[in-house]
């Protein structure tokens, strides 16, 4: 369908933008990140400030632990455009955490919690990881317990990870 849109409406930038964005998402879901990133790059050539693509691209790079500087720059644009978007705050905070900046990441997660972050198992898990890294174990466990209650397979291996973190706290 996306290729058809690109054939039919090559000069309609809003349609081609959505087509490349959708193709990027589909390729990512199929596990072909190389093609996903190429599709996202094409979308960003049409609109370099398209926050949906910027966030997904940045998040997927962060999950792979790749190109964190690029991911940071893309994610920064998203929180500047939508400072109360819990998903974008999560991506930005997670990238900071992966860069070894847990203390800098914490306020972004606190803010995300005010704007829907408590509805997301992923965001609560990420926040708990940040708190754990900062040795705020009790609060980390509060968020992990909330995440465990809501987890419906969204975060694979969460229960085992929380058990391991509890063991690490006892040492």
Task: Indicate residue ranges for each PLM-predicted region.
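Residue-level recognition of tetratricopeptide repeat
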Residues: 25, 59-60, 94, 129
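Residue-level detector of the short coil/turn that links helix A to helix B
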Residues: 31, 65-66, 100, 135
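Short coil turns that delineate tetratricopeptide repeat
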Residues: 10, 14, 48, 83, ...
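TPR alpha-solenoid repeat register
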Residues: 15, 19, 53, 88, ...
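Position-specific recognition of the canonical hydrophobic site in helix A of tetratricopeptide repeat
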Residues: 21, 28, 62-63, 97, ...
């Amino acid at each position: 369908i996306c290729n058809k849109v690109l054939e039919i409406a090559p000069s309609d930038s809003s349609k081609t933008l959505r087509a490349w964005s959708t193709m990027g998402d589909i390729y990512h879901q199929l596990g072909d990140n190389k093609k996903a990133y190429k599709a996202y790059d094409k979308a960003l050539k049409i609109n370099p400030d398209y926050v949906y693509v910027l966030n997904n691209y940045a998040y997927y790079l962060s999950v792979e632990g790749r190109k964190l500087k690029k991911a940071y720059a893309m994610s920064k644009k998203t929180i500047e455009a939508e400072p109360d978007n819990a998903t974008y705050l999560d991506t930005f905070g997670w990238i900071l955490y992966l860069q070894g900046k847990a203390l800098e990441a914490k306020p972004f997660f606190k803010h995300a919690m005010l704007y829907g972050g408590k509805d997301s198992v992923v965001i609560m898990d990420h926040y708990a990881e940040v708190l754990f890294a900062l040795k705020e174990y009790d609060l980390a466990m509060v968020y992990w317990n909330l995440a465990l209650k809501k987890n419906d397979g969204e975060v694979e291996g969460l229960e085992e990870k929380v058990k391991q973190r509890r063991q690490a706290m006892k040492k």
